[in-house]
Swiss-Prot record:
(1,4-beta-D-glucosyl)n binds at D32, F62, S67, N153. It comes from Panus similis (Lentinoid fungus). Its main location: secreted. Disulfide bonds join C58-C191. Keywords: Carbohydrate metabolism, Cellulose degradation, Disulfide bond, Glycoprotein, Polysaccharide degradation, Secreted, Signal. GO terms for cellular component: extracellular region. This is Unusual AA9 family lytic polysaccharide monooxygenase B. GO terms for biological process: cellulose catabolic process. Glycans are attached at N153, N195. PANTHER family: ENDO-BETA-1,4-GLUCANASE D, PUTATIVE (AFU_ORTHOLOGUE AFUA_1G12560)-RELATED.
Amino acid sequence: MKTWAVLSSLALLASSVSARTVFSSLTVNGVDLGQGVAVRVPSSNAPVTDIESDDIICNTGFIQPVSKTVAAVPAGGTVIAHFHHTSAGYVGPDPSDPLDPTNKGPVLAYLAKVPDATQSDVTGLKWFKIWQDGYTPATRQWGSDKLFINGGNATFTIPSCLQAGQYLLRVESISLLNAEQYPGAQFFLSCGQINITGGNKVQPVGVDFPGAYTSTDPGIVTDIYEVGTYTPPGPAVFSC
């Protein structure tokens, strides 16, 4: 019998609620930009669950006014996306900050080139994946486990060969706690606003949101208590 098979629906609901998390700030090459700066922060830490909704692009219901800052990031630079339990960022001791450790799933980062990173319309963009942290069978550790251990810091490098210009940076933590069927997976995501400087002229092929994820994708519909190997949803990670 599965260890968790006896959990009540109430307990599952409680875990689902406490697993909530929000990407709400950025650090670029060691410089913390501050809470809500250059990030479209949703006012709620509730997840997106409908992968066919436009909410799967950058979320919805943003704290107003939305930041007009576009963060300068050199190609090849290091970015940290900071997650916390609430939209306000770190607000003091909280056993569920940055997310409840019962949350299990991958953490991923995408970019989409845009004319203006502050534009309100985010539909029709082409997204390419630049980083992911999925599941390590040898240690039975998920990307979300590392996110918790690292205090909500998802750290990755901007590819050095990318064409300079403005981009939206989509970072998400996916909870697979109740993902044995669709809908079940929960998507916690926001979009940062960056301007990549330097670099080269590479424009990677992108995918659509909605569209990149499907209701039958084993990266979205899975049993975390019986997982052997795991491939996160979406395209392969781009590399120069």
